[in-house]
């Protein structure tokens, strides 16, 4: 499973959504997904591992990475924010196994604050700020809260 992990382009470079090379910050894990029978990619911008499955159409969308990654996965989850797609997957797995596995909204907020304190930047604004792809902490936590309510209806521990 790859979540929001930059994949290489046709030229084997790693580009952020603005076309800037970030190869020096990326391990070449793309090779782990080649020829593997079952794999999952979760992405939002076109440059993430898995989005190579849509490499032919991504260049036609203004807000997506061009050139896109070419690294494919057997399954692809696309969401407005990659984290949200991952949370949806975890909620689905929670339902299947009958156990609540999803992080709480407060724990997620704490984690975001910690990584920002360590120097992480927001993927949309390119600024060291408590946001996730342009969404502030409150806006971002709404997805987890909604998924937690969904799980509440399932009587999961």
Each model region followed by its residue ranges:
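C-terminal functional extensions of proteins
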Residues: 48-157
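Glycine-rich beta-alpha junction loops
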Residues: 5-7, 43-47
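Internal alpha/beta domain cores that form substrate/cofactor-binding pockets in large enzymes
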Residues: 32, 36-37
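An acidic, phosphate/nucleotide-engaging active-site surface
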Residues: 2-31
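Hydrophobic/aromatic beta-strand patches that form the interior of the parallel beta-sheet core
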Residues: 38-42
